[in-house]
């Protein structure tokens, strides 16, 4: 199934203008088989707990990805591997949080993309997001696992009200906070769309129309990434921000 994917990526995180610690973590890499892995994790728990959770999660999956000894044969193999490594990472973080008082309550979101040939897998926990640029429109392809999104989906709450709801940042799912992981995995055909993965600190401070305008542009990826972070800080920088940009050359 595997075929070497050619493209460029850029990762960037920033603590913003309010938080003292950056609890967001991101990584992007290509393994020897030409598979692409992109991850953004937004830690939570405060007092450096979230920083440990997000960093440990991304580093563990990175290590497992680089240790792969064979190619993914099909979509089932992709899903099985992602579920396995995320489950293992969850167990490690949960154990650490429950065996060491200083890490009690830590957890993290995860938005992961695995590209294998013409297939794009997303794995989602929490409220970080994956966007694709489809027909010049920025389209969110993951679903926020938040209380307000639950209200929108099940109770018909208007998005305008949800945007100012006092519980709009409350997660309904996080990694490391429970012994069992609840992972949302989806696979779709990949047609070389541009990809943006980001934490809520970015999309809450930069309107989607502006995200799209920058992603559409022809600047280098590092310039786009820095523009996005600068935009977020200009609009208040109320939270840590993490992002990954990917542009295919296939």
Where are these regions (language model features)?
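PP2C/PPM-type serine/threonine phosphatase catalytic domain
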Residues: 1-250
